[in-house]
């Protein structure tokens, strides 16, 4: 027998040792490949069987219907509810990514008192004690609630001894409500029937992104703009900035910032003179003729006459206005002007339709200013902040964070944020996936929100309404009598809905049908409106933002992370912005002509300074912006919102003033900026490679005329569509289906929801900014953006 170590055993031991070294280098906590090795006994389930729950998306106030697929009682994928009348089975990118709110590791896992973990019992004791001590000097700050939550909070404040409720939404539509009140006597938002329009004149409203219900708008716009019967309806974008919405337009009319209202009135003046309608407007509109407003708007006289002729020839017209880019201190006046244009063109009750029920008016940003004043003076002893993030979202000049030092702050929230970091007491709340609620986003649309799974392990959270209800009942035994939890309260509200819709059956069967369907959806009823004569008292002025006294700053909103509430979702950070193709960052859009005059290269680091603050970000050349303006998207620049959000980009709100319009909403546009070159190069990651097709015919296009005559080329030459040899001769290989995908790129608006859905469906990992920069793009679907042409006549194509 040989002594010593054989060659075979040597390699064997080396292999074992190498494997041991690899294992030792991994994380200490082993991954559980089989999560249910010991199945739970407290509920029944069938392994690998999918169940769908109908609920409501709460990523924004659009409140789309949602269908959540679960397996083993875990939520796995969100899709749109096909039964819902608004989104009809679709979801936007934020809706697709909403699952990351549920499983986010940066959720609050337990109550915190001054940043230290405490048990729930102690947290509730502190909460009830401060409610008693406040003696009605309470303020409740939360997002606008269209469902039962609003009345619940009002009743809770009464039970707690009194107080005030203030709604906060940075992207509110209150200016539009105010304009509609002046124009039609209705302080609510109408239905915009895109599909009924022959021409859309859009005055800076980003209706495919963050204006109204973008999912519904996208569907209806696609129907309106589709090629049908040899023709295609027109969409003209009238704005100082081309957003994703503007990129889908047939024509861009560049205007001076803040002059949307003047252009709308000039077009209305021409149309009114042609059809001789609304005689009471004759003298009023004469002051806004194309000849009189051309210099102020920067739009040639003949162009405004062309737009009026288009509206007459290709009607019905749909004129839209509002959004960030037009949010000057004259927002209300601008929107009244758009309403006048719709009225004189005959759009009312055709493409602009009001419901028979009016929506309740909500608070505005002036109410928030008063709240800050009350905090500073010590009038408010207890401030409850429900999920919103005003510390991040408000301009620093309002000194909201400093005012919090004068009161006791309780934050009831699921996610970490700058606001929860500033609170004295944090009570972790459940997400919308784990709790009950409802929403009534439109007349006749009653949507239910139900828990689709139990609370995620490791997060000791409670429903925010149950937290409030428990506290109220511990103080006032008569509070919410007969309600053991918020579900009881909610069901009583829905009993009233059952009676209203005429359902005479048992409530149990009615409730089950509501949960199965996602709500109760009644047929919309409309009420005719007419233009109020008092619109002639509204004066639309030139804001004077196109001179050489600095560049006008246009804060825009990303369709991905919105106002910043989506910044801690890695899918939304890693999916490239459809226009800039930039990931994990902020940028400053600047016209190439302006940049070259200032000696600023594309992708250079520049310093942006306004009278209110200064930030550094990357310059991004964009033909689609006025030469005397720059644009910076909102939503980045977080400091205490979780590891995904923190440290990326800048917060544009740090550059803005606290000036407001006549409706009490922030005048986001009106701040002048100076630029300074800091560095010739920046580390900004974008995925487009080259914005030009370089003759490769990747994103082909044709004209309606050629298509109608049959002269349009099919777009390329036949190429193999698969790597493998054809197996059509193999019996049964393509039965029952042969998989394929066809995408109508003419209807695609670049919303990127498909890319986020790809991450969700296939459990694709994110790699972060650095690895994306070296080509580690993990999504199985790419959305390529190509630029054609130069200057104001450029064109954007998606492929």
Label each region the model flagged:
Residues 1-275, 283, 291, 300-302, ...:
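N-terminal export/assembly segments and adjacent metallocofactor-ligating motifs
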Residues 2, 67, 138, 192-199, ...:
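Domain-level signature for respiratory redox metalloenzymes
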């Amino acid at each position: 027998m040989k002594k010593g170590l054989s060659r075979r055993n040597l390699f064997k031991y080396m292999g074992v040792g190498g494997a041991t070294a690899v294992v030792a280098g991994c994380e200490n906590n082993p991954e559980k490949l089989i999560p249910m090795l010991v199945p739970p006994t407290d509920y029944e389930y069938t392994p690998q069987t999918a169940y769908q729950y109908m609920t409501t998306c709460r990523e924004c106030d659009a409140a789309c219907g949602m269908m959540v697929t679960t397996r083993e009682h875990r939520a796995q994928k969100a899709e749109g509810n096909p039964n819902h009348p608004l989104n009809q089975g679709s979801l936007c990118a934020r809706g697709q990514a909403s699952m990351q709110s549920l499983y986010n590791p940066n959720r609050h896992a337990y109550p915190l008192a001054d940043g230290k973990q405490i048990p729930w019992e102690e947290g509730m004791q502190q909460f009830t004690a401060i409610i008693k001590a406040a003696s009605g000097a309470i303020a409740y700050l939360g997002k606008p609630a269209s469902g039962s939550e609003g009345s619940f909070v009002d009743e809770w404040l009464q039970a707690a001894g009194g107080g005030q409720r203030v709604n906060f939404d940075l992207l509110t539509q209150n200016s539009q409500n105010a304009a509609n009140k002046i124009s039609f006597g209705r302080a609510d938002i109408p239905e915009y029937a895109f599909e009924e329009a022959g021409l859309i004149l859009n005055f800076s409203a980003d209706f495919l992104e963050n204006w109204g219900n973008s999912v519904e708008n996208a569907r209806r716009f696609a129907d309106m703009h589709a090629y049908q019967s040899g023709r295609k309806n027109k969409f003209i974008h009238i704005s100082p900035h081309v957003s994703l919405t503007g990129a889908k337009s047939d024509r861009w009319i560049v205007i001076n910032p803040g002059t949307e209202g003047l252009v709308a009135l000039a077009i209305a003046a021409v149309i009114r003179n042609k059809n001789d309608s609304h005689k009471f407007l004759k003298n009023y509109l004469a002051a806004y003729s194309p000849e009189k407003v051309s210099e102020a708007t920067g739009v040639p006289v003949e162009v405004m006459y062309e737009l009026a002729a288009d509206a007459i020839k290709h009607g019905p017209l749909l004129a839209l206005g509002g959004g960030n880019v037009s949010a000057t201190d004259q927002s209300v006046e601008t929107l009244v002007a758009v309403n006048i244009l719709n009225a004189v063109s005959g759009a009312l009750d055709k493409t602009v339709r009001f419901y028979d029920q009016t929506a309740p008016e909500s608070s505005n940003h002036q109410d928030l200013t008063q709240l800050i004043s009350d905090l500073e003076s010590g009038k408010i002893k207890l401030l409850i902040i429900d999920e919103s993030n005003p510390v991040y979202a408000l301009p620093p000049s309002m000194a909201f964070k400093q005012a919090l030092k004068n009161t006791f702050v309780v934050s009831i929230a699921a996610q970490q944020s700058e606001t929860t970091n500033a609170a004295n007491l944090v009570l972790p709340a459940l997400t919308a996936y784990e709790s009950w609620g409802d929403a009534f986003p439109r007349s006749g649309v009653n949507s239910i929100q139900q828990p689709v799974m139990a609370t995620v392990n490791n997060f000791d959270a409670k429903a925010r309404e149950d937290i409030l209800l428990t506290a109220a009942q511990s103080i006032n035994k008569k509070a919410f009598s007969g309600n053991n939890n918020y579900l009881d309260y909610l069901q009583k509200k829905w009993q009233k809905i059952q009676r209203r819709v005429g359902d005479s059956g048992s409530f149990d069967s009615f409730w089950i049908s509501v949960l199965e369907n996602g709500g109760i959806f009644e047929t919309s009823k409309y009420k005719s409106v007419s233009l109020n004569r008092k619109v002639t008292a509204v004066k639309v002025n030139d804001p004077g933002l196109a001179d050489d006294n600095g560049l006008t700053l246009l804060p825009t909103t990303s369709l991905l992370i919105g106002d910043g509430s989506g910044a801690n979702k890695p899918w939304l950070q890693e999916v490239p912005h459809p226009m800039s193709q930039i990931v994990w960052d902020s940028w400053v859009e600047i016209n190439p002509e302006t940049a070259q005059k200032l000696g600023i290269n594309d992708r250079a680091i520049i310093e942006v300074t306004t009278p209110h603050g200064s930030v550094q970000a990357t310059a991004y050349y964009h033909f689609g912006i006025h030469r005397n303006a720059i644009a910076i998207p909102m939503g980045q620049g977080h400091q205490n919102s979780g590891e995904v959000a923190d440290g990326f980009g800048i917060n544009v709100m740090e550059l803005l003033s606290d000036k407001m319009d006549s409706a009490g909403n922030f005048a986001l546009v009106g701040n002048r900026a100076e630029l300074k070159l800091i560095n010739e190069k920046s580390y900004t990651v974008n995925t487009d490679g080259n914005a030009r097709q370089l003759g490769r015919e990747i994103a082909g296009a044709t004209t309606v005329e050629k298509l109608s005559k049959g002269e349009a080329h099919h777009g390329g030459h036949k190429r193999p569509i698969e790597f493998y040899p054809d197996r059509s001769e193999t019996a049964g290989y393509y039965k029952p289906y042969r998989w394929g995908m066809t995408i109508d790129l003419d209807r695609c608006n670049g919303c990127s929801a498909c890319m986020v859905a790809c991450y969700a469906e296939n459990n694709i990992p994110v790699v972060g900014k650095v690895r994306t920069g070296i080509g580690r793009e993990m999504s199985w679907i790419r959305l390529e953006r190509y630029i054609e042409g130069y200057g104001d006549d450029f064109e954007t194509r998606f492929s």
